[in-house]
């Protein structure tokens, strides 16, 4: 029998009993729980940053922090009173269910327990463009979320979807992971806009705002521009430093991987990867997920740095099921846990590329006008696709969820520090000494390097290994999502989710209490 080391005054068994009691999705959790419990129990000795030999970066799609974790305890969520706070957004009238400049809408729950077609599991994909997100931000007032959606909503009833959120009942696995490891409530996407430019920041800390190397990149092209960009990306820095790396991509969609729904890992968008014999192509384009990733873990060949793309259908991108995305995260964790020698030296960082058009109440840090590298400087701004004449600021974008999953980040822990996608590159820099030359001075000074998310002072916490598979409980949610997944993703015409009326302001959970990790020690 595994030992019962207490965590924040609560044994592991008590923790999971409490977590299971907090959700109606007990069956779903009963299958995923053992996987997470095994991860929770892995117990390397207290140590240092150098004890982490593998950094695995897994990026999901289009969710804001408030949208997923606004009700999570001890975080900067719906109970936040730090000014300026604008939870009540003007532009939609919940009583008349219509666009109304005088109407006020509060954040409201997407209830995933409702019947087919009207459940909140699969909702319409809000606009999250460079134009739309700058309009929502509104010069820092953060008060224009609903009007910003109107021009991009073919069905008026989908305008207020920007204000929807989930709770523990709707996202049992996400909340269980947040309770078990480190959650970051100050993690922002890198750019006020969509997927491709934010993923470029994740991979390179740059979108070429001066237009010298194929940019600026402000939108998601329908067809990825293969071998078009030429600025330096982080894999090249790792290669030069002799630090092993790979990009693992799910290639289920075949040729569609090079389209707006594929997210091809971005390495093959760069001229440097044109030669299939180059290491950029061999390690940045060829590896598959999950097969090659699982094989490398099994055979002790996992590189020092990995970028993981589970695939669009599992990405949590609206209007696909949110809990199927949870399966993708747990599956990656399960692969790492399959080899304890690898898991004990690994940090898995799960983040989301951008907020997806979903409301977040925290105003992101932004630089003053003219800050080098943080505004688009090409002479003809109107010639830049998707710019709408807006030069910036580029970022930071709005908050997104981020979980740090590692034997060195056992929780429940929280970190309030400011991070963005370039923080993962700064962590690589801190651990392996590899420079991030594209990182601007302003951004380098503004965001942390994520070393504070680890609790290196914590003692080992071994437990009995126990694995199971959650997929059987996620798949039944798919049939009711088929119409919305197609309509809401492709044409943004999903069946609208009706805003409840009368409304009341949501509140946060009061438990569990979250500690602060020690960071470097």
UniProtKB/Swiss-Prot annotation:
Its EC number is 3.1.4.3. Residues 1-39 form the signal peptide. It holds the Pfam family Phosphoesterase. The keyword Secreted applies. Residues 501-521 are annotated as: Disordered. Its main location: secreted. It is found in: Secreted, Cell wall. Optimum pH is 8. One of its GO terms (molecular function) is sphingomyelin phosphodiesterase activity. GO terms for biological process: symbiont-mediated disruption of host cellular anatomical structure. Induction: Expression is induced in vitro in the presence of phosphatidylcholine. Also induced upon infection of THP-1 macrophages. Belongs to the bacterial phospholipase C family. Polymorphism was discovered in the phospholipase plcA/B/C region. Involved in virulence. Induces cytotoxic effects on mouse macrophage cell lines, via direct or indirect enzymatic hydrolysis of cell membrane phospholipids. Hydrolyzes phosphatidylcholine and sphingomyelin. Does not have hemolytic activity. PANTHER family: NON-SPECIFIC PHOSPHOLIPASE C1, NON-SPECIFIC PHOSPHOLIPASE C4-RELATED. This is Phospholipase C B.
